[in-house]
Amino acid sequence: MVRLLAKLLRSTIHGSNGVSLDAVSSTHGTPGFQTPDARVISRFGFN
């Protein structure tokens, strides 16, 4: 799970514009992933 989150955060940081996060959110219904990228990253401590 941690590896998955790190992978998603990496793809967001590298400019996927949150597409991966949106896909995960709609597939798995994970709360907190439909926020803007910066908010998601800061939520996990990647400020």
UniProtKB/Swiss-Prot annotation:
<dbReference type="GO" id="GO:0031640">
    <property type="term" value="P:killing of cells of another organism"/>
</dbReference>
<dbReference type="GO" id="GO:0042742">
    <property type="term" value="P:defense response to bacterium"/>
</dbReference>
<keyword id="KW-0078">Bacteriocin</keyword>
<dbReference type="GO" id="GO:0005576">
    <property type="term" value="C:extracellular region"/>
</dbReference>
<comment type="function">
    <text>Peptide antibiotic that functions through inhibition of the bacterial DNA-dependent RNA polymerase (RNAP). Inhibits transcription by binding in RNAP secondary channel, where it sterically blocks the folding of the trigger loop, which is essential for efficient catalysis. In contrast to MccJ25, does not restrict access of nucleotide substrates to the catalytic center and shows a non-competitive mode of inhibition. Shows activity against closely related Gram-negative Burkholderia and Pseudomonas strains. Is not active against Gram-positive bacteria.</text>
</comment>
<feature type="cross-link" description="Isoaspartyl glycine isopeptide (Gly-Asp)">
    <location>
        <begin position="29"/>
        <end position="37"/>
    </location>
</feature>
<keyword id="KW-1017">Isopeptide bond</keyword>
<keyword id="KW-0929">Antimicrobial</keyword>
<keyword id="KW-0044">Antibiotic</keyword>
<feature type="site" description="Basic bulky residue that acts as a plug entrapping the tail within the macrocyclic ring">
    <location>
        <position position="43"/>
    </location>
</feature>
<protein>
    <recommendedName>
        <fullName>Capistruin</fullName>
    </recommendedName>
</protein>
<keyword id="KW-0964">Secreted</keyword>
<feature type="propeptide">
    <location>
        <begin position="1"/>
        <end position="28"/>
    </location>
</feature>
